[in-house]
């Protein structure tokens, strides 16, 4: 995957694809996922929805995998994480959707914000403006947030027998590719402890 993601526009597309994958799979979302080749059409909407609920919400007798940073990093306290995320979003005038019920620390929200930063970087380069503030913000956001909790999230997700387990490695590769592009000597997120 790393060879394919060498520019901010491609990274944004990758983050948005992962955001779609980890969003609740209602019928419309399932159609978009199958049309874009992100989900095998043989996996019916009903099955994908049941897999989502079992993996992330109800567990079906097993522990669920939380999609929230604050629940994956209890040592830091969720309130502090939420406040820091809101400051990140406010600094860049990134508004959370009034219709969206997700919290600022939801995986999908964080993925969408990273996609937005990548698109801002792309626009700055295209327009001859300084793109470095967007690169620094993405580096900082990854270090402080997504890359900090992704290894544990992946470990738990990949330990499930859910259809969603297959997306953990792809998400890890995307984040590694982005951090590498930003010049980070990132620990390998794929090497789970």
Curated annotation (Swiss-Prot):
Keywords, sorted A to Z: Chaperone, Cytoplasm
Main location: cytoplasm
Cellular localization per UniProt: Cytoplasm
GO cellular component: cytoplasm
Pfam families: Nitrate_red_del
UniProt cross-references to InterPro entries, sorted A to Z: DMSO/NO3_reduct_chaperone (IPR020945), DMSO_Rdtase_II_chaperone (IPR017843), TorD-like_sf (IPR036411), TorD/DmsD_chaperones (IPR050289)
Purpose: May function as a system-specific chaperone protein essential for the assembly of an active selenate reductase SerABC.
Family recorded in the similarity comment: Belongs to the type II DMSO reductase enzyme chaperone family.
NCBIfam families per UniProt: DMSO_red_II_cha (TIGR03482)
Protein name: Selenate reductase assembly chaperone protein
Organism: Thauera selenatis
